[in-house]
Amino acid sequence: SPEYAFEKEQRNVEAGIERFGIDYPVALDNSLSTWTNYRNRYWPATYLIDADGVVRHIKFGEGGYDDTERLIRELLEQANPGVQLPAATVLADETPELGTTTPETYLAAGKVVNFGGDEDYRTGSNAYRFPSDLERDTFALDGEWEIDFQGATPADAPAAVRLAFTATQEVRLVLSGEGTVSVAIDG
């Protein structure tokens, strides 16, 4: 079930499958029927279903990959005793512990929870200015922005986003459109 509009594009999903060498079936659920039927509220969500169609495990959020693999192997062995499985995947789980990094930050009007600017964050065309001080784990905008339920789009140049983040290894952005993006750390 796609979280972002670009994830609904079959060509993008196919490119990701190719890039990461995924050789198992991948379903593209643009109508969110799986999401709706399972009353899901989280990305990512993992549902393990046994050979009889019974949901045997549900996991919300990242991490716990070794447990998920162990459970998958158990379900495969229960469905087919004596099955020969390849060796278990051995990868370090680098999921940060809760509270050690800045939570996911969304600029969409319906999902924003950590806006640290002085203005109201609302849909439509709005003018923003960076506050003199930005609290940890919050973001602020500067310039003219068009805010909607998919995200925030600069309405005029220059426009900027400031994020006071805590990270262990990386910061990820989901962006679209045309133009130049500059990233400055501690600057």
Residue ranges and their predicted role:
Residues S1-R19, N30-T34:
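Structural microenvironment flanking redox-active thiols in thiol-disulfide oxidoreductases
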Residues E9-R11, P25, W43, K111:
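Short linear sequence elements within intrinsically disordered, low-complexity coil regions
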Residues R11-N12, F20, L32, G53, ...:
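Sparse, context-dependent recognition of short Cys/His-centered cofactor- or disulfide-binding micro-motifs
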Residues N12, N30, N37-N40, N80, ...:
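Detector for Asparagine
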Residues E18-D23, L28-R73, P86:
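Thiol/disulfide oxidoreductase modules built on the thioredoxin-like
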Residues D66-G187:
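Non-globular targeting/processing and membrane-anchoring segments
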